């Protein structure tokens, strides 16, 4: 399954170091959402979700407010761009970026791939068909229980809102649906008054691959360089 950058980073970095790197990416998502749909979360579902995700990462309110205000300034001139690449061992990579300078972004990404023998950026559209786009929501199991709902009740309640799969992972419940069902699923959570812990649009590989430890170690070097770029807000691979 393709993995978004925040899940991989959480496993390999300390909490404060993680925060220092994730905040700029979260701020960009908030700024772009406010620029596209207005600065009022009540009428802008994309902004509401971006703020929710920022709060889940303990981003301070002042940072969130500043990111919203930035949408009306020159600093808010951001665009969303996706790039694709290949690495050794059959690894496929999709990079979702938010940038105010696409020339800088692609130059940086190319430099990371050029430092890795056998890796290269490929034309957009070359790999996209090998990933399914999904809406993914997370909530706490305890919040479901607070509503006097079983997981079966929750699944039944959200089917009409586009739910395709429900999975229990530790103390969390993961809800997946079609990419185009994101807004509808969000409305489903709101109708149930069930707090969302995190919400995102993800790319999941149709044919995931497995790497051995040595292959993974070599591949991680490239993935780490990409993830550390402030313009990259999400990274997906076909690694199991």
From Swiss-Prot:
Domain of life, source organism: Bacteria
Sequence similarity: Belongs to the TACO1 family.
Pfam family, one: TACO1_YebC_N
InterPro entries: Integrase-like_N, TACO1_YebC-like_2nd/3rd_dom, TACO1_YebC_N, Transcrip_reg_TACO1-like, Transcrip_reg_TACO1-like_dom3, YebC-like
NCBIfam families membership: PRK12378.1 (NF009044), YebC/PmpR family DNA-binding transcriptional regulator (TIGR01033)
Native source organism of the sequence: Helicobacter pylori (strain G27)
Any one of the GO CC terms: cytosol
Statement: the UniProt record of this protein carries the keyword Transcription regulation: yes
Gene Ontology MF term list: DNA binding
UniProt keyword list: Cytoplasm, DNA-binding, Transcription, Transcription regulation
Transmembrane segments: none
Chief localization: cytoplasm
Protein's UniProt name: Probable transcriptional regulatory protein HPG27_148
GO annotation terms (biological process): regulation of DNA-templated transcription
């Amino acid at each position: 399954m393709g993995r978004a950058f925040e899940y991989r980073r959480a496993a390999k970095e300390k909490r404060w170091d993680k925060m220092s790197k994730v905040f700029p990416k979260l701020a960009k998502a908030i700024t772009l959402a406010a620029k596209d749909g207005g600065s009022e979360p009540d009428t802008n579902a994309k902004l509401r979700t971006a703020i929710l995700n920022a709060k889940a990462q303990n981003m301070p309110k002042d940072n969130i407010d500043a990111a919203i205000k930035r949408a009306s300034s020159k600093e808010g001139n951001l665009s969303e761009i996706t790039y694709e690449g290949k690495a050794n061992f059959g690894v496929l990579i999709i990079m979702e970026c938010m940038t105010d300078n696409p020339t800088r972004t692609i130059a940086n990404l190319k430099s990371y791939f050029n430092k890795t023998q056998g890796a290269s950026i490929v034309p957009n559209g070359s790999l996209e068909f090998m990933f399914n786009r999904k809406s993914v929501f997370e909530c706490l199991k305890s919040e479901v229980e607070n509503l006097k709902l079983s997981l079966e009740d929750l699944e039944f309640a959200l089917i009409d809102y586009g739910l395709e799969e429900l999975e229990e992972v530790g103390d969390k419940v993961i809800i997946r649906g079609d990419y185009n069902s994101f807004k509808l699923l969000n409305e489903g959570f709101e109708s149930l008054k069930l707090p969302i812990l995190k919400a995102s649009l993800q790319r999941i590989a149709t044919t995931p691959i497995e790497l051995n430890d040595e292959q993974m170690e070599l591949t991680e070097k490239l993935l780490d360089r990409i993830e550390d770029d402030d313009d990259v807000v999400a990274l997906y691979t076909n690694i199991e």
